């Protein structure tokens, strides 16, 4: 007999935000119920909040559509941000010199699971 799948995953790859900044937002929702996590994200004034919110909504939709899980029973079991490719640029400086600019990207991953009551 096939094992019942009780979690769903969503990820956004190569998002143009520094991983260090995105992790601040992701740390707020880890372990929370999806309703509470969405509320937290809507009132968090950080650039990463809408990105993480979109990934969370995608994970919830994946759970409902692909695995027939009830969204009321879901919580954020895993949420992490990995470093993506870095875009390297240069800023011209005085005396013909240049300073490097690293435009960092992130891979945002959110996994939602059913609560075992």
From Swiss-Prot:
One example of a Gene Ontology biological process annotation: translation
GO molecular function: rRNA binding; structural constituent of ribosome
GN (gene name): rplV
Function: This protein binds specifically to 23S rRNA; its binding is stimulated by other ribosomal proteins, e.g. L4, L17, and L20. It is important during the early stages of 50S assembly. It makes multiple contacts with different domains of the 23S rRNA in the assembled 50S subunit and ribosome.
A GO cellular component entry from the record: cytosolic large ribosomal subunit
Protein name per Swiss-Prot or TrEMBL: Large ribosomal subunit protein uL22
Family to which the UniProt record says this protein belongs: Belongs to the universal ribosomal protein uL22 family.
Subunit structure: Part of the 50S ribosomal subunit.
Lineage: Bacteria, Bacillati, Bacillota, Bacilli, Lactobacillales
Superkingdom: Bacteria
Protein keywords: Ribonucleoprotein, Ribosomal protein, RNA-binding, rRNA-binding
């Amino acid at each position: 007999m096939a094992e019942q799948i009780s979690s769903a995953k969503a990820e956004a790859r190569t998002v143009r935000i520094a991983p260090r900044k995105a992790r601040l937002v992701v740390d707020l929702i880890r372990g929370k119920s999806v309703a509470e996590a969405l509320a937290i994200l809507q009132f968090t004034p950080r650039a990463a909040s809408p990105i993480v919110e979109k990934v969370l909504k995608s994970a919830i939709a994946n759970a409902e559509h692909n695995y027939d899980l009830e969204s009321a029973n879901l919580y954020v079991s895993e949420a992490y941000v990995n470093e993506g490719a870095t875009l390297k640029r240069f800023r011209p400086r005085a005396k013909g010199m240049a300073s490097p600019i690293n435009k960092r990207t992130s891979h945002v991953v959110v996994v939602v699971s059913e609560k075992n009551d």
